């Protein structure tokens, strides 16, 4: 599966000067919403992701995604795997489980995002699940931005990956993009202003 071509064809492979959720800057951004707006394509991607997870022998009961970006990817993965789906969301900047969702003791979860960069939001969701007695048996995403190691593609993890090394991460593709701390951003140094994706039509 040529994930880069899928993102480019959907107009989801963006070039510019972007402020990422992590606070870092990047010249490239993957706007997964542009891919997931097509249900048939979203379903095909989720089917392949479910196949990869199953091929690695990871068994799970439910899928959890951090809102907002991970919801469609996680829901489609749960559909493909015929599992339950829940999501976490931020309330006053704190990741929380709401809306009557529950986690059973010993319930096995895949935490699914659309994109994994450093994995910070996915880790927050995982910590909520574990705090409620659940077990996180894997992480998944449509795309990995190259900082965390993938069980199915065997790339090397970088020091800023926040995901635990003993829990497998699965993705359909790996994108190696440079990211910069704001104070060391060459795009800022050239006079460009970082845009938060979604704030100006992106």
From Swiss-Prot:
Q: What is the reaction catalyzed?
A: orotidine 5'-phosphate + diphosphate = orotate + 5-phospho-alpha-D-ribose 1-diphosphate
Name its GO BP terms in alphabetical order: 'de novo' UMP biosynthetic process; pyrimidine nucleobase biosynthetic process
Which EC number applies? 2.4.2.10
Q: Which InterPro entries match?
A: OPRT (IPR023031), Orotate_PRibTrfase_bac (IPR006273), PRibTrfase_dom (IPR000836), PRTase-like (IPR029057)
Residues recorded as binding 5-phospho-alpha-D-ribose 1-diphosphate, renumbered to this chain, are 93, 113-121
List cofactor names only.
Mg(2+)
Task of the protein: Catalyzes the transfer of a ribosyl phosphate group from 5-phosphoribose 1-diphosphate to orotate, leading to the formation of orotidine monophosphate (OMP).
Task: Tell me the protein family, please.
Answer: Belongs to the purine/pyrimidine phosphoribosyltransferase family. PyrE subfamily.
What protein name applies here? Orotate phosphoribosyltransferase
- Corresponding gene? pyrE
